[in-house]
Regions:
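N-terminal cap/leader regions of alpha/beta-hydrolase-fold enzymes
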Residues: 2-288
Length: 288
């Protein structure tokens, strides 16, 4: 293990800037939450030292999963998702996507507003650091190499990746960067999955070999109604097994601590649980 160290909307910004525990876990292994271990680790990448949380069951070797955080970075809610996965029998790495510029979390969520230019001036460069060409690909390769070297990871099993908001495109980039190791990827209210740029994440689909589940927010679909069809067509053309599903909830609905927008809560627990259930079913089938 690495050294341990104890008038722009949310969805519009993500698209422009970066372009379920209800099911059983892999195999027959389910562990109690009390048996989950959480470690602060450092993963060395070509661009520096990435601070991460490594979360795994207390005993045994298990399929690995990478969680790409949303724009608010590595924090308690993301670690909570990792603990939930670990309790279902997965070994999970949650990286700080902004390590090139700052330690986690990088952004103070208290009082943050996507309409506040001062807040945005802090966030844009951070998102740009992971959105840069080649950054996520280098990170994904380093993360998987780290995971494959850990005793709690069964490296004979495929790896999963899930991402929220800006993490959705990072899942696509991960799936394409290390296709031989990736078994499944989930994008939840991912921003900018289809653009008119040559770097659009959906153009990476032919490089993928694993399964994908793309959960689309209602307001993202309203803003870009043809995106889901572009994704479905790209998956079909590449013979990549995938499901693209539009939810009734708005962008950010899967993340428990997502700040309210216009005094309305974003997190929608019932639909978040539905999405989690879909993810777990995919992991159970694909991370073998």
């Amino acid at each position: 293990m690495a050294d341990e160290k104890n008038d722009l909307t949310r969805r519009d910004f993500v698209a422009l800037s970066l372009a379920a525990g209800l099911a059983a876990a892999a195999g027959d292994t389910i562990v109690a939450a009390a048996e989950v271990e959480v470690h602060n680790v450092v993963v060395k990448t070509p661009d520096g030292d990435c601070d991460c949380a490594f979360i795994h069951p207390g005993t045994g070797a298990h399929p690995a999963v990478i969680i790409w955080p949303d724009a608010f970075g590595l924090r308690a809610s993301m670690i909570g998702m990792g603990k939930r996965l670990a309790a279902d029998g997965y070994s999970v790495l949650v990286p700080n996507p902004y390590y090139r510029m700052t330690k986690a979390p990088g952004i103070d969520m208290n009082g943050f507003s996507f309409q506040n230019q001062a807040d945005m001036a802090k966030l844009r460069p951070l998102m740009g650091s992971i959105g840069a060409a080649g950054a996520a690909e280098k990170d994904a390769t380093a993360f998987i190499a780290f995971l494959d070297a850990q005793k709690p990871v069964d490296k004979t099993k495929k790896v999963g990746a899930q991402g929220y908001c800006m993490g959705g495109p990072l899942v696509f980039r991960t799936m394409a960067a290390v296709p031989s190791r990736m078994g499944a990827g989930g994008s939840f209210h991912g921003g900018g999955l289809t653009t008119d740029q040559p770097t659009s994440p959906h153009l990476l689909i032919p490089k993928m070999k694993g399964r994908l589940y793309v959960a689309v927010a209602a307001n993202d679909d309203q803003r870009q109604p043809d995106s889901k069809d572009k994704l479905k067509a790209a998956f079909a053309a590449a013979n990549v097994p995938a499901e693209v599903e539009v939810y009734k909830s708005n962008h950010g609905w899967c993340v428990p601590d997502m700040p309210a927008e216009a005094d309305k809560p974003i997190y929608n627990k019932p639909e978040a649980e539905q999405a989690w259930s879909k993810l777990m079913a995919m992991y159970k089938a694909a991370l073998v």
